[in-house]
């Protein structure tokens, strides 16, 4: 009798567990339609990560990983924006001013912050770029589409900044011209990233 009771109890626990699993475990989710081209090169059916067997084994696990990566993307973006605000403010004062004391005390800080923000920016971008695809994509205008368009703008400006600064130092004759372009690239990067942050926060 005890053995029968234990068997019934055990079988009931299995049924209960199966019922729980079927109710609370979502069915497998396929790859989304209209996946962005670059994302499909990485995560598509014939994407690089599929061929190299990189990443989670199921789409559900992929979506969990995507959420974690995008959360890191957001926090790194905030850090980058704060760093860019400081760098832009100091850089503009260095460019506009003629105070040698300010230059001597802040030039190295501006340069160091430039390396820091470039590193955090690229880390931020990589979190989004290499994250698994979303559950779905649509053609309607949204905060995500606005984010992608602004990202193309501030990414280009961030790539141009160090190149222009390096060329300005190397080319004495075009120093003022290249430094002016460097400042403009920094302005575009800072304000585009600021608008991007506002858009992703308030635009639905």
Predicted regions and their residues:
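Bacterial N-terminal signal peptides that target proteins for export
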Residues: 1-2
């Amino acid at each position: 009798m005890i053995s029968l009771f234990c068997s019934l109890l055990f079988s009931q626990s299995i049924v209960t567990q199966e019922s729980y699993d079927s109710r609370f475990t979502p069915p497998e989710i396929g790859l989304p339609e209209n996946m962005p081209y670059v994302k499909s090169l990485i995560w598509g059916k014939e994407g690089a990560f599929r061929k190299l067997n990189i990443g989670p084994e199921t789409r559900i696990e992929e979506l969990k990983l995507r959420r974690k990566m995008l959360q890191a993307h957001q926090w790194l973006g905030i850090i980058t924006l704060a760093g860019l605000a400081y760098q832009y403010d100091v850089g503009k004062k260095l460019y506009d001013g003629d105070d040698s004391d300010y230059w001597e005390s802040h030039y190295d800080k501006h340069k160091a912050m430039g390396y820091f923000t470039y590193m955090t920016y690229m880390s931020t971008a990589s979190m989004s770029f290499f994250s698994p695809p979303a559950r779905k994509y649509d053609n309607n205008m949204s905060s995500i589409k606005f984010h992608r368009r602004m990202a193309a703008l501030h990414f280009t400006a961030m790539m141009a900044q160090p190149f222009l600064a390096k060329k300005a130092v190397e080319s004495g004759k075009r120093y003022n011209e290249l430094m002016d372009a460097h400042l403009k690239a920094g302005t575009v990067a800072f304000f585009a990233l600021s608008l991007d942050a506002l858009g992703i926060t308030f635009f639905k």
